[in-house]
Amino acid sequence: MVEQSDTMKGTTTVGIVFETGVVLASEKRATMGYLISNKTAKKIYQIAPRIGLTTAGGVGDAQQLARLMTVEANLYEIRRGKRISVQAASTLLSNILHGNRMFPFYVQLLIGGVDETGPVLFSVDAVGGTGKEDGIVATGSGSPMAYGVLEDRYTLGMDERSAIELAIRALRSAIKRDAGSGEGVAVVVITEDSYHELSDEEISVLTPN
């Protein structure tokens, strides 16, 4: 049995469903025990044209899963002639993780995007347990601090800018109190029309006071 504390170290990631899309966000710190091993760690991966994956946990496990999911999403589109849906991608990811439950990937993941059903967001644990998130979700060691902000400020059907600002605010709260989180934030916005990773300049403009 994998304890939750074993899969939630050294990261904070956030997912928010807004009116027309999904915001995925993370901070950039990677740690090895008490050492800050990387200050520009990538924790959000594009696995399909309108689907993103956030990762918390072991870096090697997360990178391997991101590569595998990208390949599987491409194969799905080639074989079926249509893009994989967010739910199908979460089910595939769940099956991969559950199939390795005796030798688990030490990760906690969010998978979100926009498909024919609209904006969709799922959380996935280390042994394949999935849950559809209706509005907000956070993972990693800083998630308790992030949830405090998300629960207080999230409103159903909020607009894109408000969702981005909320994600940044939640991550900043986690960074202030969680030693495993830090070094700035990364933000991805997924809508029906685009998958867009915000630049540092865009983030600085949208960062709430």
UniProtKB/Swiss-Prot annotation:
It is an enzyme of class 3 (hydrolase). Its EC number is 3.4.25.1. Gene3D superfamilies: Glutamine Phosphoribosylpyrophosphate, subunit 1, domain 1 (3.60.20.10). The keyword Cytoplasm applies. It catalyses: Cleavage of peptide bonds with very broad specificity. GO terms for molecular function: threonine-type endopeptidase activity. Residues 1-10 form a propeptide. The active site is at T11 (nucleophile). The formation of the proteasomal ATPase PAN-20S proteasome complex, via the docking of the C-termini of PAN into the intersubunit pockets in the alpha-rings, triggers opening of the gate for substrate entry. Interconversion between the open-gate and close-gate conformations leads to a dynamic regulation of the 20S proteasome proteolysis activity. GO terms for biological process: proteasomal protein catabolic process. It holds the Pfam family Proteasome. It is found in: Cytoplasm. Keywords: Autocatalytic cleavage, Cytoplasm, Hydrolase, Protease, Proteasome, Threonine protease, Zymogen. The 20S proteasome core is composed of 14 alpha and 14 beta subunits that assemble into four stacked heptameric rings, resulting in a barrel-shaped structure. The two inner rings, each composed of seven catalytic beta subunits, are sandwiched by two outer rings, each composed of seven alpha subunits. The catalytic chamber with the active sites is on the inside of the barrel. Has a gated structure, the ends of the cylinder being occluded by the N-termini of the alpha-subunits. Is capped at one or both ends by the proteasome regulatory ATPase, PAN. Component of the proteasome core, a large protease complex with broad specificity involved in protein degradation. This is Proteasome subunit beta. It comes from Methanospirillum hungatei JF-1 (strain ATCC 27890 / DSM 864 / NBRC 100397 / JF-1). The gene is psmB.
